[in-house]
Amino acid sequence: MYIERVPIGLDKIIAGKTSRIRNLVLGMIIARIINPKSKLATARGFHEKTCSNSLGKVLNLEKADEDELYEALDWLLNKQEKIENKLASLYLDNGSLILYDVTSTYLEGNGCELGKYGYNRDKKKGKTQIVFGLICDKNGCPIAVEVFEGNTSDTSTFLSQIEKVRKRFGVKNVVWVTDRGILTSSNIKELVKPVEG
């Protein structure tokens, strides 16, 4: 199968063996890159009667429904740390260049515990939002993501990412590239502290 020949081995990073849940996750990733839509529209796009590409057939997802996609996202959330650790072990090492940035997105509805009013990049008045930080390797390939409450300042997200890279990923000496709004003098002091271990 073509998916199994992807150079980075994303299929194996997500789950070692072929399974429906792995195919659902891969299908959502590929569909999001090719033609981003809602989960309902994505499921319909996989369906044998409405598919606009062969993705549903290749991954055997022609009968997938929206609920299955949400279940796959819950499954993926439980695997997030393991997947991030694997990506970090493959693509980060001492001396690596790490790209870090923060953005936000507004929310519809009011069921998200992390949804708060904060600096709104989307210019959507009266909407709660979430903030998320993304760690990427030197080529811009994502390694890890963390979601924060919507009223979290960009600068306050950075220290936890330094800790994540140093402690969880075991990468002590790196070059961080981020924007000026994140790299404050107090964050710089934390960066230049001697690393234990």
Identify the meaning behind each predicted range:
Residues 1-99, 103-116, 126, 135-146, ...:
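Dynamic "connector" segments at or just before major functional cores
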Residues 124-130:
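Short, flexible loop/turn motifs enriched in small residues
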Residues 128, 135, 174-176:
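Short, flexible coil/turn micro-motifs enriched in small/turn-prone residues
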Residues 153-197:
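An internal, acidic/charged active-site-proximal segment
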